[in-house]
Every structure is written in C-alpha cells, then in structure tokens.
C-alpha cells in the first residue's frame, strides 16, 4: 500500500491521478490524503480506484503572517498526528507527495512514522513546503534539470496523462484558438479573449474558452452580446478533447499546463500569473522560451497580443516538440522507488 497526498489545484491533482494510474497498472494499492478545501474532493471524492480517500481540514500557511501562520502550522501538526494513525492502519510503505498545501499533514506524518517520503516538485522554482521537506525525503523528483543537486534528486519526465501524447498532432495553421485560465479560471485571460473575440470572428478563427466557474455567466453574456458562437466551459475533467481541437493555446504557465500542451504538440502563448509564489509561472514558461518552444506575454504587454498572434511560428514550434521524448514520469517514479528498495 502506498499513499498519495497533495493537491489544492488542478496541476497537483493531475500528477496525483497519473501516479494512481501507474500504481494500479503495477498492482499497487493506493490511498489518497487531501484537503476539504481546494479542488481535491471535486477530483477524487468519487475516485473508486483509491482503496480509501481522506479529506482533511488543511489549508495554506505560506501566505499567512504572524500568529495566523503559527496557528495554521500547529493545526497541520495536529492533523499530521491523526494521519500517522491512518498510515499505520493501512500499513503504508511509502508516501508520495505531489505538492500543494494539502500535502503537508501526510508529509509530516510520514516523517513522524519513519515512512519513506518521496516528493515530486512540479515547478521550476521549488515550493516552500517541498524546500523544507526535501532534505528529509528519500527521493525528490523534478522535470527541471537545473534542480538536480544531490544524490536523492532525480530528473524525471513530467507525469502527464498518456492521452495527451496519443492525441498529439502537428499544427499547420490557425483555425481554432483555446484560452485556458487553469482549473480555477483567470480573469485577465478571460478579458483578453473577450477583448479580441471580434478579431478572431473576422479572421474565421474558432474560439474555445475555459473561463472558470466564477466568471462563466459574465463571459457567456459577453459572447452572446457580440453574437459570437464559442465553445465556452467552466471546467472539464476531459479537457484533452478541447485541447486536441485547438491549433494555438493562450494559457497560464502552471507546470502541468506547460508539459501537457507540449506533449500534445500544441503551441502556446503563456501568460504567467504575476502573483504566483516566487514568480514560478514566469520561470516555468521561460524554461520553454529559452528552447524556442513557446512565446511569453506578460500582463503589462497586453497590447502586443495580436502582433504575437500574427507573427507566431505555429508549424515550426509544433514540429519542434517532436524532438522531445515523452515518457511516463509516474511510471519512472514508481520504478525508481522500487529500485531504491522502498516498495
């Protein structure tokens, strides 16, 4: 039995799902430990492939200050003591953390129970919790080669659902554009899509738009007032079907988006969320930009958007993705864990 912990947002949860799928292929039973907050329950409350699912009252600590931060940390320790009992009950051999605030209780519980902790870091800048726990982990997995610094750190292909690879194709010309604000939506990207919708209509370019639940009504009303037919949705677990129809993406640059779009050979204009911790979304996108595999549009350069669209080397970038070998990162993590004699 292994435990998978972490989440909060879609990027972390997508990795958790990949690990679950790989574990089931290899005959490993899994439990999941996440949070009542964030999107953990939306993704996994009905996921029967897990032997058991636990959702705790955990929340973030990093953005809190003073006594509030101390109180939140003490609450995590209290939760960790309860999780320690859960790990012992299920005779868990290893705890895999995919990051996010909901991974904290189970990660600390693993250390308390002397159960091997294995961490996946999804971003180009290591998160605060992962940075704290890294020295105590048995293995630290990353898809960013500049994070390799110690013997327990392993370069690992980014865990993505294999369907992104299976449905990959070279984009030849811009017929459809998809706006992706992430699993929670992004008002800036929504506004950018609405502002330029008439331009795309005039050019005969179809719009696919993930706008998030909180902004759905506003976006729907705006498109209707412009009499523009658009594939508008708030959230879709099977988003690959939307992505596979698109020829160009406009997206935040969370790590999962970065690698999923790359695996699908879908060129992208990344708009990093400027308030992300350690500005990690910008550095995620920069990792691809330095390899001529994307364009970056910062929010203060909004007026450059159409120029970037008109001069975007669509076919060239899409073709370059063929040079990248796509392997199953979740399979690699489990293989390495077995090689280390942990499971």
Residue ranges and their predicted role:
Residues 92-94, 244-259, 266:
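Acidic donor-binding loop of glycosyltransferase active sites
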Residues 4-7, 24-74, 215, 298-300:
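Conserved nucleotide-sugar phosphate-binding/catalytic loop shared by glycosyltransferases and other
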Residues 315-327:
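A short, well-ordered alpha-helix in the C-terminal region of glycosyltransferases
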Residues 65-94:
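An amphipathic, basic-hydrophobic alpha-helix
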Residues 29, 50-52, 111-167:
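Active-site-proximal region of nucleotide-activated glycan assembly enzymes
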Residues 12-23:
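Short amphipathic alpha-helix
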Residues 1-9, 16:
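Nucleotide-activated donor-dependent transferases that construct or modify glycoconjugates
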Residues 38-49, 168-248, 282-285, 290, ...:
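Donor-nucleotide binding loops and adjacent catalytic segments primarily
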């Amino acid at each position: 039995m292994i435990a998978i912990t972490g989440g909060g947002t879609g990027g972390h949860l997508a990795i958790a799902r990949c690990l679950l799928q790989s574990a089931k292929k290899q005959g490993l039973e899994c439990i999941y430990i996440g949070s009542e907050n964030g999107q953990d329950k939306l993704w996994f409350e009905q996921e029967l492939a897990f032997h058991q699912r636990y959702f705790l009252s955990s929340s973030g600590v990093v953005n809190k200050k003073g006594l509030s931060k101390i109180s939140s940390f003490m609450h995590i320790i209290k939760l960790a003591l309860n999780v320690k009992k859960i790990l012992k009950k299920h005779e868990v051999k290893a705890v895999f953390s995919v990051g996010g605030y909901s991974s904290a209780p189970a990660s600390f519980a693993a250390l308390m129970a002397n159960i091997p902790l294995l961490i996946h870091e999804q971003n180009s800048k290591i998160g605060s919790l992962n940075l704290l726990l890294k020295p105590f982990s048995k293995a630290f997995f990353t898809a960013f080669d500049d994070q390799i610094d110690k013997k327990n750190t392993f370069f690992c292909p980014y865990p993505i659902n294999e369907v992104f690879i299976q449905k990959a194709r070279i984009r030849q010309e811009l017929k459809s554009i998809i706006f992706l604000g992430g699993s929670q939506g992004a008002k800036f990207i929504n506004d950018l899509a609405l502002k330029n919708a008439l331009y795309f209509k005039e050019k005969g370019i179809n719009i696919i738009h993930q706008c998030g639940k909180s902004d759905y009504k506003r976006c729907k009303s705006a498109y209707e007032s412009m009499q523009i037919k658009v594939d508008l949705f708030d959230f879709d677990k099977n988003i690959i079907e939307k992505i596979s129809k698109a020829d160009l993406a406009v997206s935040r640059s969370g790590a999962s988006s970065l690698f999923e779009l790359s695996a699908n050979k879908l060129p992208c204009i990344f708009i990093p969320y400027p308030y992300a911790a350690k500005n990690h979304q910008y550095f995620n996108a920069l990792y691809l930009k330095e390899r001529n595999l994307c364009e970056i549009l910062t929010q203060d350069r909004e007026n450059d958007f159409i120029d970037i669209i008109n001069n975007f080397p669509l076919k060239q970038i899409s073709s370059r993705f063929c040079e990248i070998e796509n392997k199953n990162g979740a399979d690699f993590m489990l293989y390495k864990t077995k090689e280390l004699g942990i499971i």
